[in-house]
């Protein structure tokens, strides 16, 4: 996905072709690889009640798709970068076994599984298998890469990482409509090469420097979760914080899931982020 940034890069960020998943490949041969996905949104659109086979966006279908990517890449770990479930307030009783079952199926592939809490993940922790590693909204660092959801300020440790990976934005790109696809909407990756100088809004807000030279925003894993057509519309207020503050002072480009470079993106002014304490983990590492 484009040329790498200058300087030493200990971990390769490799988008999985034709899939909304990012593979972290450390240079060290003994280091495990991690597959990063975001915005799974289990329970979206009434998919719990629909009859028949697993519908698009259902937990079973999403688990099948994620397991297929795990087997295809041979990864040793899976990290969900926020919004594992869709309901924002709590976890409805009907959704609780679905959440547990989804993560249990991924764990059954003998991979380490983690979740960085997103704004939709309030109340999810008691309904996860105990083997799932849970990280707060401030994010975590894997092999030098800072990973967070994007709705709240990352921790200072994450901010100091050389590269950042986030979700939350549901990035998309609108192509010319066709008879087969009248809307022309596509999920996409956003990749930014930033200037090394830290962004001023971060210095004022957190007294911390954003040292990342490369930022990657992953597309929503759930295909029915909707997209922000970044080449046509300004992101919704709840998502523009990430797009404005963290992607500023750099060059942003969009790539379709098949790797097609569809060009540069405008970066609008950001809105205020949520507090980092808005979503907290009951346990984590």
Question: What are these model-predicted stretches?
Answer:
Residues 1-81, 85-285:
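Extended recognition/assembly regions associated with phosphoester-bond processing machinery
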